[in-house]
Structures are given as structure tokens and as C-alpha cells.
Amino acid sequence: MSEVNEETLRAREALAGHYKEVLGLLGEDVEREGLLKTPERVAKAMQFLTKGYHEDPEAVLRSAMFQEEDYKQMVIVKDIDFFSLCEHHMLPFFGKAHVAYIPKKYITGLSKIPRVVDIFARRLQIQERMTMQIKDCIQRTLDPLGVMVVIEAQHMCMQMRGVEKQNSLTTTSDFTGFFQQAKTREEFMNLIKHNR
């Protein structure tokens, strides 16, 4: 278990004070038993849910980057579960990311792709930007022949409030290089279909 540094603890304490104030402004009795530790719990949870601000996704990819000049086909990591927070309402959105790249000179450890997804998801986000950030990070770091990212997500800000559409699913995609060719994109989309 990693140690929590002083700066993190100070920030957590300040956040907890603000959350206590929010609870009071909502009309709650902040001294009732069930809420006594809630501000600290929420502060700790928010630090975890936004820890991606303090992590370097390019360093994660570089930590397991290997030269491989022979393999020139798609590498796909699909059905990567993620949770994020919408920057507009700070409500969760969650779903699956599907990521592919076509190596030119380098490959990366397979576990590094989900880690990159998590780093960008653990920030206040919008799905469209998260899709682009994952694509751009892989393209910049591995310099492959192409990258494609598809994200499918449910947004609690659409399900719990607003239009209240509980079964809606939002899909975003972005791509570079060889994935600009319709045939390559079609191959990727066929490979990530959920026909198990």
C-alpha cells in the first residue's frame, strides 16, 4: 500500500472541510452519527477518483516499450472497464474502452493500455476528450502506423437527472494513420464486436 504524502493529507483535510460545509448547505445535520466521517470519506474518494492528474500515461507506456519491427498487424485490447467523472456535474460515467494500434517499430506491454485508459479516466472528463487523449498518448509515445480508440459509456448525468434516459449509451471514436482507411476501421469494429 502506498504512503500518503503530506500535501495529499493537507488537501484531503481541506476538501473534507468543504464537503462538511456542502452537507450543511444541503440541509443536513452534519453532526448526526451517519455523517460524522462522511466529509473525510468523500474527500478520500475524490482524491482516488481524480488520481490521474498525478500520473504520467506516457511514462507508463515507456516503462514496457519494446522494439518489434516484424509485427505489423493490429494489437487490440478491448472491453477495458473504466469509471470516470463528468466534468459538468461531477457524476460518474462508465463503460468500456477498445484500443488498437498497428506497430511500426515499438510495442508496449498489454497491461499498459488499460493503465493509460485508467489514468485519463481518473480525471474530471468528457468522453470525447478522453477518447482523443488516449489516442494521442499512444500515437505520441509508440509512434505506430495507426491508433484507434472506441469508448462506449453510460452517463449518470443523463440517467439520474436531466433527460433521465436510463438505457442510453454514448459511443465515441478517434483514429490516426492506417485507421483512416475504412477497411482497417471496419476490421477493428468487427474484432471488437460482442459476439462471444
From Swiss-Prot:
GO MF, one annotated term: GTP cyclohydrolase I activity
GO BP: one-carbon metabolic process; tetrahydrobiopterin biosynthetic process; tetrahydrofolate biosynthetic process
KW GTP-binding (keyword) present: yes
Catalysed reactions, semicolon-separated: GTP + H2O = 7,8-dihydroneopterin 3'-triphosphate + formate + H(+)
Keyword Nucleotide-binding assigned: yes
Highest taxon of the lineage: Bacteria
Pfam families: GTP_cyclohydroI
Keyword terms: GTP-binding, Hydrolase, Metal-binding, Nucleotide-binding, One-carbon metabolism, Zinc
Enzymatic class: hydrolase
Residues at which Zn(2+) binds: C86, H89, C157
Pathway: Cofactor biosynthesis; 7,8-dihydroneopterin triphosphate biosynthesis; 7,8-dihydroneopterin triphosphate from GTP: step 1/1
Oligomer and partners: Toroid-shaped homodecamer, composed of two pentamers of five dimers.
Recorded family membership: Belongs to the GTP cyclohydrolase I family.
Name of the protein this chain belongs to: GTP cyclohydrolase 1
